[in-house]
């Protein structure tokens, strides 16, 4: 009986742990904040193609993913990734806000039907603090989400 109870408790704990969203990470599709431009481009070339390069150290990449159509990548003056934005496909499976991070810890704003969830993630274990922002017109599904260095201005 003790063995059966232990197995049941282990099963319940594993279900609860797998249902909880993971701690947000400072990356999207393998493109991490502070990554060098060369490393970011190598990863991006493996998952998509460059569509536009801006003089302001910004790039737009079309990616081969069922849920994300494009990645926007911005670099700082040292050509290290300062932000990454993922644009959700309109013709693919939708991404729920809660898949990105725990909604209970987000700051939420709704302005003229536009939903915005913001998480401020503290730095720890050698990782810098960063901000995660998810936006969309639908109250459940996002249109885009971004990770950016905590010291950066708002991403439009």
Question: For the regions a protein language model found, what residue spans apply to each?
Answer:
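Positively charged n-region of N-terminal signal peptides that target proteins for export
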Residues: 1-4
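Bacterial N-terminal signal peptides
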Residues: 7-15
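Non-cytosolic coordination micro-motifs
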Residues: 20-58, 86-156
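N-terminal, post-signal-peptide region of Sec/Tat-exported proteins
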Residues: 44-80
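Aromatic-patch recognition
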Residues: 79-82, 87
């Amino acid at each position: 009986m003790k063995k059966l109870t232990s197995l049941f408790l282990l099963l319940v704990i594993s279900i609860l742990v797998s249902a909880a969203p993971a701690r947000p990470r400072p990356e999207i599709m393998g493109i991490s904040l502070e990554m060098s431009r060369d490393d970011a481009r190598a990863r991006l070339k493996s998952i998509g193609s460059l569509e536009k390069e801006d003089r302001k150290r910004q790039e737009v990449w079309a990616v081969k993913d069922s849920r994300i159509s494009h990645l926007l990548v911005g670099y700082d003056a040292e050509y290290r990734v300062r932000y990454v934005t993922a644009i959700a496909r309109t013709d693919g499976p939708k991404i729920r806000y809660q898949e990105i991070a725990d909604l209970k810890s987000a700051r939420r704003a709704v302005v003229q039907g536009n939903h915005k969830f913001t998480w401020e993630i503290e730095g720890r274990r050698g990782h810098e603090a960063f901000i995660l922002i998810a936006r969309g017109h639908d109250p459940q599904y996002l249109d885009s989400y971004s990770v950016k260095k905590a010291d950066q201005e708002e991403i439009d």
